[in-house]
Regions:
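Thiamine diphosphate
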Residues: 1-166, 170, 173-324
Length: 324
């Protein structure tokens, strides 16, 4: 079936709720309204208010209540309307969600999946366009997942919902309706913690995730016209990171470019660059470069293009790498 990322996410939620009656969805407007982006559309009518719960605008309460649900054997799926609204819940996530399994020596698990849209590219204001995934990657005990297409969105979400450990599931708003793709109607999993090479190349490696994958593809096609073969690695799971896949690619190509829309300073690109330096230094023909968002608050919509990494900036970085 051809579907958008929103439809793929909705189908994954529907199928898993049918399969496992312990799955509970909760969040602001997820019930009767079907979610701010309609990712939960139809679920309230199908499963009822006891399994699709509208909550107040209180992120700490949404996540805190979800922790309590896991103690009762449920598998909650809290939705936060935008990544920029998650910060009131950080104490719950850092102090409890990520630690309970270790704190109880495995007697309790926290099988919850926190879903939230993230990222710029849709002309939205600051709290609605943030990309602070590196904050979650700094917290041991969390799995951080970002799909870049409808097929992966369904499979990764299915795998997340079946995980006994907590997952931060980040959904790029720019890609919600940007692309339609063939997605199997039957249920399936895309493995967590596994990166994938989505484009083969011999001259350099681009490492990216989420909405930066389509941008990297556009830049790679333009570079191909100039005789440069760019390989693209889609991380898919940001933490724990599949370092082996991108290190193997860099050892083959000899050049590396990391692309993310989060600000540059202390972004995940720095960790990836350090990993390459530690594991593939002698294979490098050029320094590792980064194309990222600017180190500023997300600007007003008319200036978004100055902040947001696009194919043109990626192509310029490719050309610079090939000068070495």
């Amino acid at each position: 079936m051809i579907m958008t990322m929103i439809q793929a996410i909705n189908q994954a939620l529907t199928q898993e709720m049918e399969r496992d009656d312990r799955i509970i969805i909760l969040g602001q407007d997820v019930g009767r309204n079907g979610g701010v982006f309609r990712t939960t559309e139809g679920l309230f009518d199908r499963f009822g208010p006891e399994r699709v719960m509208d909550t107040p605008l209180a992120e700490s309460t949404i996540v805190g209540a979800s922790i309590g649900m896991t103690a009762l054997g449920l598998r909650p799926v809290p939705e936060i309307q935008f990544m920029g609204f998650i910060y009131p819940a950080f104490n719950q996530i850092v102090s409890h969600v990520a630690r309970l399994r270790n704190r109880t020596r495995g007697r309790f698990t926290v099988p919850l999946t926190i879903r939230m849209p993230y990222g710029a590219g849709v002309k939205a204001l600051e709290h609605h366009s943030e990309s602070t995934e590196a904050l979650f990657c700094q917290i041991p005990g969390l799995t951080v997942v970002v799909p870049s297409n409808p097929y992966d969105a369904k499979g990764l979400l299915t795998a997340s919902l079946r995980s006994d450990d907590p997952v931060i599931f980040l959904e790029p708003t720019k890609l919600y309706r940007a692309e339609k793709q063939e997605v199997p109607e039957e249920t399936y999993e895309v493995p967590l913690r596994r990166a994938v090479v989505v484009r083969e190349g011999k001259d350099l490696t681009i490492i990216a995730w989420g909405a930066m994958i389509p941008a990297a593809r556009q830049a790679a096609e333009a570079a191909q016209a100039e005789g440069v073969g760019a390989e693209i690695v889609d991380l898919r799971t940001l933490s724990p990171m599949d370092r082996e896949t991108f290190v193997a690619s860099v050892r083959k190509t000899g050049r590396a470019l990391v692309v993310h829309e989060a600000p540059k300073t202390c972004g995940l690109g720095a960790e990836i660059a350090a990993t390459i330096g530690e594991s593939a230094l002698l294979s490098l023909d050029a320094p590792v470069l980064r194309v990222t968002g600017q180190d500023i608050t997300v600007p007003l919509p008319k200036n978004e293009g100055l902040y947001y990494p696009g194919p043109e900036r990626i192509l310029r970085a490719i050309r610079r790498l090939m000068e070495y």
